[in-house]
């Protein structure tokens, strides 16, 4: 079997570490792993298939001989190294938002638009975590009738803000338990026992950057430039896995039974929808999973042609690392 040299750019971060873990779990044909990070991490090691692999400093010369680069770094790092990656002949599967809306760069969720992988010119973008979870959950509904408009509210775990998010949540809980104060460093407000209805800065007409990512990326992935989307993104005191409440509106009636049938068969989805027996998606159940749980499917009482649903997914795995490795799997099948 052919093997590939795979680099992980940002190998010491939460998503980079998860990428290395998922490469092993999915038995991706890695002949050589090249973990890349900043100078301060160079010389340290990561475990891969039971071996210690030395981390190298990210530099333009580090991509020579690499077939696939999995990007788990911030926008500025992705933009800095993208030219060298493409020039080296590698394919850059980038988890940052740097290239997502570039018309020359495919934006891929393998369960939704795998065919777009063939259009790459050296860079493929991994969508925003909440976007991935949402479009995976709702895309099958388009086989019944095209979604005309969509309204979503996200409930995003603190680990979505990086490794410091869960630490801050736990520190605040402990401080409050002891009657002490704790000055937030990661979040703009106390997150323990609280909700923060802002993720990202203000970008357009009162919408945040995170909310605009959801709206713009969903259109591109589903090839629906005319789709109207409105979104509210909220940070919640949950450690891992994002949850999304979605209302979809169509030009014709779509029944709950129809929706359940197509979602139950949809790739990457698990139908968990039994309200009488208290069975529905919850972040605790989806953590460390690679599929999106979908439930609470019901009519939208404000629109005869509308449906509401609730979905949960692990934002570190399906929302980032696993989706990137699935894209790499599409590449090696070409």
What is the role of each PLM region?
Residues 1-191, 227-228, 292-293, 297-303, ...:
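N-terminal Rossmann-like NAD(P) cofactor-binding subdomain of oxidoreductases
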Residues 69, 158-334:
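Charged docking surfaces used in two-component/phosphorelay signaling
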């Amino acid at each position: 079997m052919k093997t590939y040299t795979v680099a992980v750019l940002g190998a010491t971060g939460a998503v980079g570490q998860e990428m290395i873990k998922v490469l092993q779990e999915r038995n991706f044909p890695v002949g050589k792993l090249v973990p890349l990070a900043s100078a301060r991490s160079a010389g340290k090691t990561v475990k891969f298939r039971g071996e210690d692999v030395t981390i190298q400093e990210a530099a333009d010369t580090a991509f020579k001989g690499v077939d696939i680069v999995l990007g788990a770094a911030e926008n500025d790092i992705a933009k800095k190294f993208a030219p060298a990656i493409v020039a080296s002949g590698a394919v850059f599967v980038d988890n940052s938002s740097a290239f997502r809306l570039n018309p020359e760069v495919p934006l891929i969720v393998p369960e939704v638009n795998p065919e777009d992988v063939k259009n790459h010119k050296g860079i493929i973008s991994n969508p925003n975590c909440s976007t991935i979870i949402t479009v995976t959950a709702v895309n099958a509904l388009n086989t019944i009738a095209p979604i005309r408009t969509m309204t979503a509210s996200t409930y995003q775990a603190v680990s979505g803000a990086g490794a410091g998010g869960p630490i801050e949540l736990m520190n605040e809980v402990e401080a409050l338990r002891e009657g002490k104060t704790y000055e937030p460093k990661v979040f703009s407000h106390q997150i323990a026992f609280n909700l923060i209805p802002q993720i990202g800065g203000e970008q357009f007409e009162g919408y945040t950057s995170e909310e605009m990512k959801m709206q713009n990326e969903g259109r591109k992935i589903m090839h629906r430039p005319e789709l109207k989307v409105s979104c509210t993104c909220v940070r919640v005191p949950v450690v891992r896995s994002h949850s999304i409440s979605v209302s979809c509106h169509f030009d014709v009636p779509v029944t709950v039974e129809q929706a359940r049938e197509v979602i139950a068969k949809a790739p990457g989805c698990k139908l968990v929808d039994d309200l009488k027996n208290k069975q529905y998606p919850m972040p605790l159940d989806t953590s460390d999973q690679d599929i999106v749980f979908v439930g609470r499917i019901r009519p939208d009482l404000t629109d005869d042609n509308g449906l509401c649903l609730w979905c949960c997914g692990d934002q570190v795995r399906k929302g980032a690392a696993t989706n990137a490795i699935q894209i790499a799997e599409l590449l090696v099948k070409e």
